[in-house]
Amino acid sequence: MNVRARLAPTPSGYLHWGNLLNFTLTWVHTRRAGGVLALRIDDLDAARARPEYISDIFETLQWLGFDWDEGPRSPQDFQQHFSQAARTEEYRRWVTRFPGYACDCSRQAVKARTAEFYDGFCRTRGLQLALDKTQWRLLSKKPQDDIVLWRKEDAPAYHLVSLVEDL
């Protein structure tokens, strides 16, 4: 079995004990299996990502003595070649490759109809995708599993970015 794993911290704060435990378990498992380990920094939320948090990721991994096979080697390499926040156009090209539908429901509207989950309201409405006015939902077997891949704010959703990055 070929093992591929990733460390995927979010630079919205300094790393914490949960990150360190996850990194340790992932690193040990991947190295014991002779697998490939990637570093993917999830900076999609550009408003909360800060340079000092990105630097902390590299400093902590170096301090722990962890290596990785793929991904950025430094904060500068990350900003120049790997930043998700700078790759919106790439994600835009991917979004409609997945079976789905446009949806203009707000969270408030969904909550008013059903407090538990998305009810599939837009599945058959035939809305046209307008990346700045509608979201793109992945069509799945059950409406509550129709996750958002593109947000109304004309930005990729975390699920889409994670999927594209892991391909």
Regions found by a protein language model. Give the residues of each.
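Active-site cores that bind ATP or allylic diphosphates and position pyrophosphate for catalysis
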Residues: 105-167
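N-terminal Rossmann-like or analogous alpha/beta NTP/dinucleotide-binding catalytic cores
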Residues: 1-119, 126
